[in-house]
């Protein structure tokens, strides 16, 4: 209900959470009959028959990707721009990633998830599983590219340096940054 009532512009995080919420309800409804029949059966650990893709992609996948669309740019913004606030023009958090790539990865990931869930429920032929899987993989690759470009374009660290803790590689003027101890 709060997502519908919100007054701010929808971001990639909001769009993914808007998929997560009904996917979670749908997964619960699909799983309920199996859990009522045999609540401790190992084959029902992750829900009823045909609900695995809905749980893995519709619930967990959209929740994780939506959260990463907020956390990664936020951490970069706090590290790079927060101390400049009020002294110079700084970008908004949502300006750090590419909106077009975010829209593309959302469409690909959603389309792939819908195809996989529909194939699981026998609403589409089994061949749709391959198509759906391909769309999910492509959407995941576009998301990863968007986040890696965000890190590359706005962080003083190289991609490897951010992971392994190397000193910053470049400053705005192209010189190697000095490490503050």
Language-model regions, residue ranges each:
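Hydrophobic alpha-helical transmembrane segments of multi-pass integral membrane proteins
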Residues: 1-181
